[in-house]
């Protein structure tokens, strides 16, 4: 299956319709639940949906290492590629890896000022303009 078909058949399309087309630019969505209920996996699924549409994602992890977050992306992408019979999964994986930036703030070191500064540096030095920011913690 081609990436476009994977996008069209995503369960997120139902979610978007239920909130009248999605959150929209500048709006905030919040996912809350007890630890271990799948919040990170849910957010990675949303991020992968954006990444596979060619959009960039900035993922901020407050309680997990960068490697741990990347493992979530790898596992969920691999499952998606397998279950959808994704054509040219290697190219799609490369697009995902190039389109995401993962930062971590362990030990209660996160602040919105630090997040804004990191985004400003990404824009200025790497020309990385994310369409979505995921704050996971």
Place the predicted regions along the sequence by residue.
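A conditional alpha-helix N-cap/helix-loop micro-motif detector
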Residues: 8-12, 39-40, 112-116
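Walker A/P-loop NTP-binding active-site region of P-loop NTPases
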Residues: 22-82
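Conserved inter-motif catalytic segment of the P-loop NTP-binding fold
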Residues: 64-135
């Amino acid at each position: 299956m081609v990436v476009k078909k994977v996008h069209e058949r995503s369960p997120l399309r139902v979610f978007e319709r239920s909130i009248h087309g999605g959150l929209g630019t500048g709006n905030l969505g919040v996912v809350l639940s007890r630890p271990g209920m799948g919040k990170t996996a849910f957010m990675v699924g949303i991020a992968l949906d954006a990444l596979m549409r060619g959009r960039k994602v900035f993922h901020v992890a407050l309680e997990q290492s960068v490697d741990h977050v990347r493992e979530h992306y790898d596992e969920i992408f691999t499952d998606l590629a397998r279950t959808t019979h994704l054509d040219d999964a290697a190219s799609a994986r490369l697009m995902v890896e190039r389109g995401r930036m993962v930062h971590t703030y362990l030990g209660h070191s996160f602040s919105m000022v630090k997040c804004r500064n990191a985004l400003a540096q990404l824009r200025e030095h790497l020309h990385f303009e994310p369409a979505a920011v995921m704050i996971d913690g």
